[in-house]
């Protein structure tokens, strides 16, 4: 069934501290001081334009919702609850910090119809959390996830590879520990240096070196493979290119690309083709038109990389996610297992 989010942006609203990487107004492209009475109008407007079919959720994005005062939380939630009770929306989703979740808050969220909570976890390495000035430890994340799951509230986890003090190994360890928590979905945002943040000062003082684009693509390709192999959905990879964040000077440094996930997907194919070309001079790939852009790479990057050694044929009879290489059929699972084998072996040898 088609799913629709009705977004309410509460950038910076409720956030109790300012982490080294965060300038939320720049990241969301929205600066707001929204009031509860405005929420009803926004919902009504969206419901007028959205199709009558499909599931609809109200989504409070951008802030630390559960750090808002309890009375104000209830004001926001009660507006949405009216629409839930009328059957017009399915539920409410919101984002918050792990250290702003406790038993009383979770009970309240459940009472008002909250169905999904996204936690800005970022890392499960306590050293990285400290250097990023997150203000909590891994143990608080584990406690928050358990509490939410105990009340049958879906949990999303956001992680940020490439934070201060992190490494390829520590970021993968974070992913493995996230998997153990069994979230309903994840988001992966490689760390960017945004203007007017402490991280910008650290970068300019040579105290922090962000991942290069190639490093971020290689690391994130592995993260995608690990999460997908464990059947954990990844609903976004890379920061969404809002109008504001693409303004000159907003992104100071770091691996930003407007189609970052597509870079990772193309890289996953490239690694697979490289392995096959060890034992043959040329490969002929037959693929669905729905996958050909990833096989070819952004702006034909894979075709340029392999040259005449790679021939791509579009075949409308092939289902999405499968392809034939020199007449042998492969699927997504083959691609992901190859990434894990190749990249992790390289990491072990370095």
Region spans (language model):
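Canonical Radical SAM [4Fe-4S] cluster-binding loop centered on the CxxxCxxC motif
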Residues: 2-38
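Auxiliary Fe-S-binding modules of radical SAM enzymes
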Residues: 2-4, 209-350
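Short acidic/His/Gly/Ser-rich catalytic and metal-binding motifs that mark active-site loops
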Residues: 15-19, 194-201, 245-247
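A short, N-terminal amphipathic alpha-helix
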Residues: 41-51, 221, 225
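Phosphate/pyrophosphate-binding loops at sites that engage ATP/ADP/AMP, CoA/4′-phosphopantetheine
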Residues: 47-54, 277-280
């Amino acid at each position: 069934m088609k799913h629709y989010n009705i977004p309410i942006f509460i950038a910076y609203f409720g956030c109790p501290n300012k982490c080294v990487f965060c300038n939320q107004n720049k990241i969301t492209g929205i600066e707001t001081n929204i009031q509860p009475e405005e929420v009803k109008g926004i919902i009504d407007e969206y419901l007028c334009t959205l199709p009558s079919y499909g599931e609809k959720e109200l989504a409070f994005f951008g802030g630390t919702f559960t750090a808002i005062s309890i009375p104000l939380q209830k004001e926001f939630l009660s507006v949405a609850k009216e629409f839930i009770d009328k059957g017009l929306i399915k539920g409410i989703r919101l984002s918050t910090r792990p250290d702003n979740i406790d038993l009383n808050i979770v009970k309240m969220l459940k009472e008002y119809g909250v169905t999904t909570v996204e936690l800005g976890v970022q890392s499960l390495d306590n050293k990285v959390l400290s250097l990023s000035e997150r203000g909590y430890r891994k143990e608080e994340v584990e406690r928050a996830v358990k509490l939410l799951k105990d009340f049958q509230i879906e949990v999303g986890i956001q992680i940020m590879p490439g934070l201060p003090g992190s490494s390829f190994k520590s970021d993968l360890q974070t992913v493995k520990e996230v998997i153990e928590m069994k979230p309903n979905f994840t988001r992966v945002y490689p760390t960017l240096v945004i203007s007017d943040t402490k991280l910008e000062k650290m970068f300019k003082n040579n105290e922090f070196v962000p991942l290069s684009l190639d490093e971020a693509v290689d690391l994130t390709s592995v993260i995608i493979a690990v999460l997908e192999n464990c059947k954990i959905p990844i609903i976004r990879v890379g920061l969404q290119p809002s109008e504001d964040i693409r303004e000159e000077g907003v992104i100071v440094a770091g691996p930003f690309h407007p189609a970052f996930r597509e870079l990772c997907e193309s890289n996953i194919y490239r690694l697979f083709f490289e392995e096959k070309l060890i034992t043959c001079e040329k490969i002929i790939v037959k693929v669905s038109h729905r996958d050909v852009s990833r096989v070819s790479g952004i702006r034909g990057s894979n075709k340029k990389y392999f040259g005449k050694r790679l021939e791509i044929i579009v075949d409308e009879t092939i289902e999405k996610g499968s392809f034939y290489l020199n007449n042998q059929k492969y699927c997504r699972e083959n691609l992901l297992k190859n990434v894990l084998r190749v990249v992790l072996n390289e990491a072990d040898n370095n």
